[in-house]
Amino acid sequence: MKYDLICMGRAAVDLYGEQIGARLEDQTSFAKYLGGCPANIAVGSSRLGMKVAMLTRVGDEHNGRFVRETLATEGVDVSRVATDPKRLTALVFLSIKDRDTFPLVFYRRDCADMAVSAEDFDAAFIGSAKALLVSGTHFSQPKTAEACLAAVKEAKKFVFDIDYRPVLWGLTSPGMGEQRFVASKHVTRKLQEVMRLADLVIGTEEEFHIAGGSEDTDEALRRIQKISKATLVVKRGPLGCTVHQGKQTIKADGFTVEVFNILGAGDGFAAGFLSGWLKGKPLEECARRANACGALVVSRHGCAPAMPSGAELELFLSRSDWLFRLRESTLLEEVHRKTTGRRAWPEVLALAFDHRRQLEELGPPQRIVAFKKLVAKALQRFRGAGAIVDERYGEQALFALTGKGMWLARPVEVPGSRPLRFEAGDNIAAALRAWPAEHVVKCLVHYEKQDLGKLRTLYDACVATGRELLIELVMQDPPLAEIYAAGIKPDWWKLASPDTDEAWAAIEQVIQREDPYCRGVLLLGMEASEDELERGFALAARHPVCKGFAVGRSIFMDAARLWFAYKLSDREVISRVEKNYASLVAAWRKARQACNESVS
């Protein structure tokens, strides 16, 4: 099978209020996440190691591109995420008022995902997956129901998530998105038509009430079993779940954790169950995995971003002594942060031109700004390039490079500061919150022990704002272990090239021991000659922990001196930077290829 699972249906943008305890009316800022039951399950399933595709539509606008790009980043196949030129991507506002109140307002009238049609797929696509999952909302309208039934007809197995939202069936006023149950014979009849076709049905007790046409759970299940041979999975919140297969009933206890946010927990539960069910695991194991995923998601802000990774799930299941408030577990949150939602960077070849003091010696601010724009223009001609750019003189260059899929970092340190100081002042978290999420936080530190406090403040700010951190140490024998011992675990290190394989092995050993999820090491340049850099590359390329380089003055400084002296034209600067950068890229890749060939 090409896919383990195809998820069909809702795909939206969730705007989550960030003020916990406030009414939705009183929210002053929102976090933007991917949302929609099937999209959440797609992300959760992909994070648990399944091959997943999404079948839906999005608008031809910014939110639609956000949905598609987020799914793709999560490893979900988006080849069947169609762009609808006439409709907008669905939108939902949500908030957390208290432990029992979770207001939400849907903006879904004539939205893109409700226009999904049989023209968006073929039998071969549906048949290429072990199972097709569709949620109940898409059976609320005739045209989408027709498309979904056409897909179900071609599915190897059909998973039905009841996903009952009365407001989306037109049973409440538009502002009552939070209401979970309204009895309706019409809805019951429609859902039962679908359940006759299902192999697996997942829902809350309230959802089985509407599906079975009775507010007595046992009676509702009996009615459903008379018309469907599907395995029925009843989500019971903190109590866990029950699984009903024929005459067999399995009860699986939940995990004792604080309920922080119920929104999305059921989707995490479904992903956890499917991660076992699609592999033929015993139903008891499927239920245990489902309850664990639900417990992890219910402890967090957001839906899709809260879904656990496989590593995180296994860690959670390996122990029973977790804090009641799971989100306060440093270990779990660290593993979650470093194993989910991150683009893979197997190679980073960055041109570092965040230099400030060195260029201030050559010319006035406006000339520095102009020069950095030229460097950025040279870099844009390369696919897969990376850059480190400052805000002070490189803001325009930074804007030009952002949003292009490049690896980008920007500095926070005051150049040359000893002890370490930040350009944005002490409230570094507030400054980082205004940065694009794709920007890596780079901090060059002339390390002394007194800098550990500042580095820890910076690390905590990066964790709180969801930013990656690169620490640059311009010294031989960098004190990585000492920094790790202070609770600081950067995503990246930027280091001078060690002189021996033994020195590289020592660095690898420390990183693997202290933070196996570290992205890796980038080599700095220190205005070394190309020959010197190539020798360093040849050694570094033998060690997988080194992912590439972040070199600056070796590439652009000669051109800068001539350009600031009016001895070089703009075009010549661009040409020289292009040539020097391309030469280093070729040297690195040649060194890495030689190592790979020697291993094979």
How should each PLM-predicted stretch be described?
Residues 1-6, 186, 213-331:
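Conserved phosphate-binding/catalytic region of the ribokinase-like
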